[in-house]
Amino acid sequence: MQVSVFHTPELVPEGTPDCAVAVDVLRATSTIATALANGATAVQVYADLEALGAAAAGYPREDILRGGERGGKQVEGFDFGNSPLYCTSERVAGKRIFMSTTNGTRTLERIRHAPVVLTAALVNVGFVARYIRSQAFETVWVVGSGWQGNFSLEDTVCAGALVEQLGGAANDEAVAAAALFDTWEGDLIELLERASHGQRLLKLGLLDDIVYCAALDTVSALPRQTAAGVLVQGMA
């Protein structure tokens, strides 16, 4: 198995791997994992808010939730922003979630044509790694979402956790990501607080989100794409 890491969707090369993994630790893939683990029937992601609204209009209002975030803040008129702490079983069980975020949804759009598309965050990275190890994938691409096209510490450390568990680092970015995880595994909250996007969230009073997203393997979820942009709880 050859595992390559790309820090942002803009750096993803042409071609298609056997498996592609989208990572947006703060906070889209943490929220997706939490929602599915707590009983959401699906999470449907869109980069464009208008497209999200049009798709959501095809479902009874009582059966859906709309999550919208831009710049770390909830989009006006949406049910929630991009916080995994919102996604309790009381709120999301049995619901189809339509979601658009600043960074993570762009990553999923970039890799949507891979035969197997998964999402990972620190909260479910071990669950995802176990599934990937059980398959006969020759090539795995782990793609960070970054922030508006720039490198992010939090996505890279999560990618590193995957590389550590899968082995087979195929590019320098994968080696560097694994080294970052080795260095910070015991203090992930501090790393996320130091990260530029962590700093943005702290200014918005979202420390609890950072603490939640920094926890390793607290969520049993394997978000897997079944149609372009549609993620459900997969089998592990």
UniProtKB/Swiss-Prot annotation:
It is an enzyme of class 3 (hydrolase). It catalyses: (2R)-O-phospho-3-sulfolactate + H2O = (2R)-3-sulfolactate + phosphate. SUPFAM superfamilies: ComB-like. GO terms for molecular function: 2-phosphosulfolactate phosphatase activity; magnesium ion binding; sulfopyruvate decarboxylase activity. Keywords: Hydrolase, Magnesium. Transmembrane segments: none annotated. InterPro entries: ComB-like, ComB-like_sf. Its cofactor is Mg(2+). Its EC number is 3.1.3.71. Belongs to the ComB family. PANTHER family: 2-PHOSPHOSULFOLACTATE PHOSPHATASE-RELATED. This is Probable 2-phosphosulfolactate phosphatase. It comes from Gloeobacter violaceus (strain ATCC 29082 / PCC 7421). The lineage of its organism: Bacteria, Bacillati, Cyanobacteriota, Cyanophyceae, Gloeobacterales. The gene is comB.
